[in-house]
Each structure stands twice: as C-alpha cells, then as structure tokens.
Regions:
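Residue-level signal for pocket-adjacent positions within structured domains
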Residues: 137-139, 156, 178-180, 218, ...
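Short gly/ser/thr-rich secondary-structure transition/capping motifs
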Residues: 173-185, 228-233
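Regulatory activation segment
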Residues: 232-240
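C-terminal functional extensions of proteins
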Residues: 275-278, 296-299, 307-309
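Terminal amphipathic alpha-helical/low-complexity segments used for targeting or macromolecular assembly
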Residues: 1-175, 300-309
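Short, surface-exposed, charge-dense and proline/glycine-enriched linear segments
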Residues: 58, 86-95, 127, 160-174, ...
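Left-handed beta-helix
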Residues: 181, 186-187, 192-193, 198-207, ...
C-alpha cells in the first residue's frame, strides 16, 4: 500500500471513529480558547509581574513605563479575544449573546487592574521562599530558578479569572504551570500570603482548599477530596481541607476532606494521612504504626520539631 492509499484509508477510519466515538470531539461547536495563545499570554503576564526576570533582554528603568504600556496593550487585545471565546462557550447566567463582546472587554480590564495587588502578594511568596530555604542564595535565584514561584504566580493570576467565572482559561493556565513545575495548584484554591512549597514536585492543592498566611509545605503534600460515588453532584460543595495560619506540612502528607481543618501553628509530619480536624498548635506524627496528635506546647523544652530539608 502506497502513502496515498494509506492516508486515504486512515482518513476514512478516523472520520468514522468521530461519528462512532463521541465525547472527545468538538465539531460544529463554539471556538474554544486557544491553549497556545493562553500560554503565550501567561508568559507575558509573568513579564509584567516580574520585570527583568522573564525577559530575554535587560529592562531599563528609563524605559519601563513605555515597555509596560506596550506589553499591557498587547495582552489586553489577546486576552480579551480568549475571554470572549470562553464566554461564548460558557456564558454566565443571564448574559445575553449580544453583550458577550462588551463583557469580555470589561472582564479583561478588571483582571488587569488587579495585577498590582497580585504583585504585592507575590512579593510575600518570594520572601517566604527565601527565608524558608537555607539553600536559597538570593531572591533573584528564587524568582529565576524555583519552579514554585512560577506556579504560584500563575495560580494567583488564574484565581482572579476563576472568581469571575471565566471558563477553561484558568485551568489551562494552571495546568501549564503544573506541567512545568510538577505542582498542581487548582485556580479555585484560596491561598493566603507568604506561601511557600519547598521542592514543589508532586504537591496537589484542590479546588476548594483554603490556605491561610505563612503556610509552608513540602513536596508530595496533597490537600485533596474524598473519592465519593456522588462525583459531579459535589461540584459546588467544599471538598478540600482548610489550613490555618502558620502551619508547616512535611513531605508526603495527605490531608483530606472539606470539613477537615488544620489548626493554626500546627506541624504535620511527613507521610501522615489525615481525615479529621487537628487542634491549633498540634504536632501530628507517626509513632511506629500509630499516628499521634501532640500538643506542641507540651514539647517546647524538647527537641526541635520543625526541620529544614
């Protein structure tokens, strides 16, 4: 069989499969947001958030105003087009079709207006990473080299769009960061200031997770939901845990369930599995085969329990 016959045969088989196998086709539907365009926009947004760090050429203070204006203008047009596609695919309740273009413009402007606030909280994440990792040489190294910073920056951007009920785009953004960093931060998660995940790889933060300020986690931590038969029926419910302020969670710990609260100032040891709430200032560890929950105040004169890895 020559190449022409092979292509013809495969074309017929694939087209037949499109009719036979549904659910993974998107034919005759709305024009979906472009994954390639969104990843390019996300990179440009990182350039705005961290000027001089994600650029190929030096950025000079004498030119920063003009360069920022030009980059904002470019992002505005591209992002507005992708948001319009997302609204056409999944319009918010009560939004008539004729107002989608205007709504996309307004949402894009509102999103961009939040960038200064996002920068302020990202600065606290950089500080948390630098102060929380003795291996960090400088803040420059943290921003340039640590995959966590890119992942949390993208999550905080995507969260703004998630709050505005923009479909598809927030998840495309965070899954791109997931692919690059190895850390899965859902755009719906509420994450406080001074957040740091050391080593990053394998950490999962689910959609309805709530994380307070000054929380530090390590690789392989999972803030996850219970796997229940109800499935999609649980979509609007709180399914993931709440982590209060100044909690440290060591590598491999799994914390599960929407009613689970880890109290302020607690330390969660490595590889523990938690499905129940923990009181503030607790230490949760394995003692042999048994998990123990201890009061950290009772151990204040004993060995240090917060380690660096």
């Amino acid at each position: 069989m020559d190449s022409v016959e092979t292509v013809t045969k495969l074309t017929n088989e694939l087209v037949a499969s499109y009719a036979r196998v549904g659910g993974i086709n998107h034919l005759d539907g709305k024009n979906l947001p472009s994954k390639r365009a969104i990843t390019a926009i996300t990179m440009d947004l990182l350039r705005l958030l961290f000027p001089g760090y994600f650029d190929e050429q030096p950025v000079h203070s004498s030119e920063i105003r003009a360069e920022t204006a030009a980059l904002l203008d470019a992002i505005l047009g591209k992002l507005e087009d992708e948001i319009r596609k997302a609204l056409e695919y999944s319009p918010p309740d009560g939004l008539p079709k004729k107002k989608i273009t205007a709504a996309a413009h307004s949402l894009t402007l509102e999103f961009l207006e939040n960038l200064p606030r996002v920068r302020e909280i990202l600065q606290t994440d950089v500080e948390a990473a630098f102060n929380g990792d003795p291996a960090a040489i400088s803040r420059e190294e943290v921003i340039v080299a640590y995959p966590f910073i890119e992942a949390i920056a993208v999550q905080r951007l995507a969260h703004e769009l998630y709050l505005k009920n923009v479909a598809l785009i927030p998840r495309i953004m965070t899954e791109w960061a997931h692919f690059r960093s190895g850390m899965d931060l859902h755009p719906g998660a509420q994450i406080g200031s001074h957040f740091f995940v050391d080593h990053c790889t394998g950490t999962v933060v689910g959609e309805t997770s709530i994380i307070g300020d000054h929380v530090k986690m390590y690789q392989g931590v999972g803030l996850v939901a219970k796997s229940l038969a109800a499935g999609q029926a649980l979509r609007a419910q709180k399914r993931h845990p709440t982590i209060e302020d100044r909690v440290t969670i060591y590598a491999g710990a799994t914390i599960m369930g929407g009613e689970t609260v880890i109290g302020e100032g607690s330390t969660i040891g490595g590889n523990v599995f938690i499905m129940d709430s923990v009181a503030p200032h607790s230490l949760v560890i394995y003692d042999g085969l048994d998990m123990r929950v201890l009061n950290k105040a009772d151990r204040k004169n004993k060995a240090v329990v917060d380690f660096q890895i």
